[in-house]
């Protein structure tokens, strides 16, 4: 696990040199690191992820980025589904990708102990929306 973290740090620092302006934004920095975790799981679709999450001019861009952290586990788990769905539209519509992932919220509650703890007994179907 430690080795994986070192690899991620090296990748992240290399990227921040090429995109220092983006890395200065706290939200982008957080998502940037999360994206590294996804790429270590599967390099498939990384260009799609970048297009979706770096559309900073889109009003929903930041909202999608924040949800991305909550949905990190299920996003990796359902990566193929997400790409097949949203990728067909070129991956350029953050809202579509957001809605596609949102459909998996209930499943995420089942597989993630962390999310169950954060929900504090709330309706699992609504807990993610409440935390956004």
UniProtKB/Swiss-Prot annotation:
The keyword Secreted applies. It comes from the Eukaryota. Its main location: secreted. To the SVP-1/-3/-4 precursor, particularly in regions where protein processing must occur. GO terms for cellular component: extracellular region. SVP-2 is one of the 4 major secretory proteins, secreted by the guinea pig seminal vesicle epithelium (sve). The keyword Signal applies. Residues 33-81 have a biased composition (Basic and acidic residues). Residues 33-104, 113-132 are annotated as: Disordered. Residues 1-14 form the signal peptide. This is Seminal vesicle protein SVP-2. Keywords: Cleavage on pair of basic residues, Secreted, Signal. It is found in: Secreted. Residues 104-132 form a propeptide.
């Amino acid at each position: 696990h430690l080795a994986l973290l070192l690899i991620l740090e090296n990748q992240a620092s290399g990227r921040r040199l090429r995109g220092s302006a983006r890395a200065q934004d706290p939200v982008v920095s957080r998502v940037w690191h999360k994206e590294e975790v996804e790429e270590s799981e599967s390099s498939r679709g990384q260009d799609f992820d970048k297009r979706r999450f770096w559309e900073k001019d889109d009003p929903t861009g930041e909202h999608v980025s924040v949800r991305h952290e909550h949905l990190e586990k299920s996003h990796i788990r359902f990566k193929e589904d997400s790409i097949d769905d949203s990728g067909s539209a070129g991956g350029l519509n953050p809202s579509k990708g957001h809605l596609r992932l949102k459909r998996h919220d209930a499943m995420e509650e089942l597989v993630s102990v962390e999310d169950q703890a954060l929900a504090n007994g709330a309706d699992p179907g609504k807990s993610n929306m409440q935390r956004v």
